[in-house]
Amino acid sequence: VLEWIFCSKIIRLNIPRLDAAKVDPVRQLVFAISEPEPLPTVLKIFNVEGQELLLSAPPENAYFYYLTFNLSKEVIVVCSFAIHQNGWYDWFYTYDMKLNTLSRSGPAC
């Protein structure tokens, strides 16, 4: 269960096999990765009211590894690939709110 408070209202979401979650204070979003097999295979992004904005599988041949922040204090997703991608296993992915998609932003080194 993932839970937070927004405008004095408790938002409670059932996310099976939740691995990690982070709040993006800049864009007022909640990111959650779940279903570890062995690493997470599902990413969900919600607005602060609990509405699901994105449900995503990881890129092909990758897993969601962890959630962190970029220099702008926005949540970014690290994806880990089984095979090198341009010399790296781990890559940062950002959420594009306008296109409602993830895009690779650079190596996670």
Residue ranges and their predicted role:
Residues 1-3, 24-37, 73-86:
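Short beta-strand elements that form the blades of beta-propeller/WD-repeat-like
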Residues 2-15, 41-59, 86-107:
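Surface-exposed loop/turn elements that mediate protein-protein interactions on large endomembrane-trafficking
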Residues 13-27, 58-72, 106-109:
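Repeated scaffold domains used in trafficking and secretory/extracellular systems
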Residues 59-94:
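A mid-sequence interfacial segment
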